[in-house]
Amino acid sequence: SIDLLNTITDAAIVPDKMLLSIQDLTNFLDTIEPSLIILQNITFANAAYASEVLKRFSCPVLLWTLREPVIDGGRLRLNSLTGAYSAGNALAAFRDGNFEYIFGAPQEERTKKTISACIRAAWLKNELKNLRIASVGHTPQGFGFGRAMDADMQKVFGATLESIEVRELIDMAKGYTDDECSEYLDKMTKCTVGLDKTPDNNRKDFARLCKAYKEYVDENNIGALSSRCWPDFFTAFGTPVCGVLAMLNDMGVAASCEADT
């Protein structure tokens, strides 16, 4: 089992020995701060072990039951599966059934795929705790389905949601000169077919908007952004923000229109 984990990730922390008492378990738990717990019953164990883990940590849990080899000899098996029933009941009580489960030996491909998927998902969830999301303006009428609440984003993903008014970025854009924005205009010209047919003032305004958004993203460490577009950028600025959001996506910043967070 340990060899399998080490082939999947270099971040696995495992005990030096089997944890055969609650004291052994608590001593080990004192040394870790996990983003994912893989709880494996090597033999029969009651729910006290799983309960001790669950009351300490809120991270995702994968319950792993070993498929035991069949050996003729009349002896009882180690009952890993029996122990999983106890642990599963504790998980259902603590997490309302919200946990992952795999029944299989370390050599089975299905076991490896399930554990790999759980580790990747846990890594992503942990990374999202460092994500800052920006909502530029509010969703227009009819687009409320895309509106996000900061408390919900924090609760579900651990991400921080901040808001800024559209006019603030428009005012930033209006304050730039053509020379200050030439870099962004050059980039857009190279990657947009037919940009030369766009009115000159719209192309320059796009470059101003692109600079304003990029500087806001960089200064505030924004990893994802949604922006109101219609009608503000048409009426107050004269140029839509759609092209800017496309450029942000190309730069590695997830961006969407109509403040669809």
Language model features: what each stretch is:
Residues 215-241:
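Hard-cation-handling environments
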Residues 188, 231-261:
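Active-site loop ensemble at the mouth of alpha/beta enzyme cores that anchors a bound cofactor
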Residues 1-88, 96-125, 130-134, 139-224:
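Metallocofactor- and cofactor-centric catalytic cores in central/energy metabolism, strongly enriched
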